[in-house]
Curated annotation (Swiss-Prot):
This is Pyrophosphate-energized proton pump 2. The gene is hppA2. Signal peptide: none annotated. Belongs to the H(+)-translocating pyrophosphatase (TC 3.A.10) family. It comes from Rhizobium leguminosarum bv. trifolii. It is an enzyme of class 7 (translocase).
Amino acid sequence: AAIFFAGTPILESAMVYPLAICGACILTSIAGTFFVKLGTNNSIMGALYKGLIATGVFSVAGLAVATYATVGWGTIGTVAGMEITGTNLFFCGLVGLVVTALIVVITEYYTGTNKRPVNSIAQASVTGHGTNVIQGLAVSLESTALPAIVIVGGIIGTYQLGGLFGTGIAVTAMLGLAGMIVALDAFGPVTDNAGGIAEMAGLDPDVRKRPTRWM
């Protein structure tokens, strides 16, 4: 999107800005790992969420530093009649971080074993395979609505703030949290594999249930 600033004095800054955001977010992701600690309930997912929250907070600060150091807070140019300011681009980055947080919350709601969607599928399974498939399909279709609305809202909001370049900055900020997000995504398959190995090895039933309790 920086090509919109071709031939202007801020072209280099516009190209460096997304790279600066990524660099800052790499550092914030590393810093966030130091906050991954078990609480009194021994919930590993809770510990991972602590790291994600810390990373998000640090990323806001990193985004502010990257914005100030590369493009500043004032007007940096005009694209298609739209005035682009560093402040607006900073808010675009914040929108990207908020969208990421909302998607994590929505995902937790639709996949958590103690939440309504999963419990409704389990309840439907009592009456047979058919109702299980029907309810599972219904929940899966329902679960795509909120993420789509959040993403569309983020696109519209960032475009109003900073045009296509602003949308690109929001996406860059989202990708900056990829380190902690991948850690969250990877934990599920690891615990599933641990439980499967325990079951195939004929270990005590409590050993099989333990990975599930970690979630």
